[in-house]
């Protein structure tokens, strides 16, 4: 696959306060990098907990929550891309070894935090993309489902497998999977705990794109970045408002959804970007959107 040249800034580790980490390279399990040059506007979140295959433990969740809280206020983030620093794995789901040490009350509190994390990802104002280059099981797939778009390697393995462990999806899987695939198919996948390949997931519509894995093991990331590059030139305010209209509109009846669309459209009318788009069309040139 042809790789597009881009300028890379260093990964910036985020350390959760008062927590010990088993992440690589300095101990942070969540790292952030803003791309530069032609890819400026794309921000990447690297999940990097190799000892536990990016399992959703306390430190991991705390760092990711803090990272999202910081990034959601940054208007320079036009696309947020989730990727893994652990080869062959996107996210292995819940940290069951850590879970075994919790009381029943602590389990309930932690799962509520997980649900809040997935809601924060879903509510992120800019488009989000999950690059699934390996296993995405249980909570790992729930994390991907919380993203707007999903790209998978054809060899990736994913599924809501909680029922095979005596559990049920508790971080949004029972709600987001049927909204993605329909009720009957979601029930089948959850009831059976079935695992899907990236290719099978693409056929069902669970992922937007499935690509053959490369030698480096990052084919899904490369395709996800190319998808982010398609979003970058578009008017960022219009894109964000389009996300709001879709997300909120699909939760209500169509008449209410049309009203939501109208409110979002009204917010976009006074923007400089709308005027720039009209001027560029009239002058037969490429628009230069600034997000204002």
Curated annotation (Swiss-Prot):
InterPro entries per UniProt: ClpP/crotonase-like_dom_sf, Enoyl-CoA_hyd/isom_CS, Enoyl-CoA_hydra/iso, Enoyl-CoA_hydra_C
Residues bearing PTM N6-succinyllysine: 97
ATP-binding recorded as keyword: no
Alphabetically ordered keywords of this record: Acetylation, Fatty acid metabolism, Lipid metabolism, Lyase, Mitochondrion, Transit peptide
Gene Ontology BP term (one): fatty acid beta-oxidation
GO cellular component: mitochondrion
Organism domain of life: Eukaryota
Range annotated as the organelle transit peptide: 1-35
Residues carrying the site annotation Important for catalytic activity: 142, 162
Pfam family, any one: ECH_1
Cellular localization per UniProt: Mitochondrion
GO molecular function, one term: lyase activity
N6-acetyllysine: modified positions: 97
Presence of keyword Heme: no
Family per record: Belongs to the enoyl-CoA hydratase/isomerase family.
Protein name: Enoyl-CoA hydratase domain-containing protein 2, mitochondrial
Source organism of the structure: Homo sapiens (Human)
């Amino acid at each position: 696959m042809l790789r597009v040249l881009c300028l890379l800034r260093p990964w910036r580790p985020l350390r959760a306060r008062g927590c010990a980490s088993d992440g690589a390279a300095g101990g942070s399990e969540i790292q952030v990098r803003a791309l530069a040059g032609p890819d400026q506007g794309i921000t990447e979140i690297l999940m990097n907990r190799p000892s536990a295959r990016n399992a959703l433990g306390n430190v991991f969740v705390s760092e990711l929550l803090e990272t999202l809280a910081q990034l959601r206020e940054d208007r320079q983030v036009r696309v947020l891309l989730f990727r893994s620093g652990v080869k062959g794995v996107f996210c292995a789901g819940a940290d069951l070894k850590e879970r075994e040490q919790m009381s029943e009350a602590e389990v309930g509190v932690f799962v509520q935090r997980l649900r809040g994390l997935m809601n924060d990802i879903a509510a992120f104002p800019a488009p989000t993309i999950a690059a699934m280059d390996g296993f995405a099981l249980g909570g790992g797939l729930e994390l991907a489902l919380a993203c707007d778009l999903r790209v998978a390697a054809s060899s990736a393995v994913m599924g809501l497998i909680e029922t095979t462990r005596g559990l049920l999806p508790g971080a949004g899987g029972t709600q987001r999977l049927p909204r993605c695939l329909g009720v009957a198919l979601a029930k089948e996948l959850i009831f059976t705990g079935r695992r899907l390949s990236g290719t099978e997931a693409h056929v069902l519509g669970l992922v937007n794109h499935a690509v053959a894995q490369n030698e480096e093991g990052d084919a899904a990331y490369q395709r996800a970045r190319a998808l982010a590059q398609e979003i970058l030139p578009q008017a960022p305010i219009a894109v964000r408002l389009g996300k709001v209209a879709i997300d909120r509109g699909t939760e209500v009846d169509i008449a209410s959804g049309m009203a939501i669309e109208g409110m979002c459209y009204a917010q976009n009318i006074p923007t400089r970007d709308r005027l720039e788009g009209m001027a560029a069309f009239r002058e037969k040139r490429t628009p230069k959107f600034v997000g204002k």
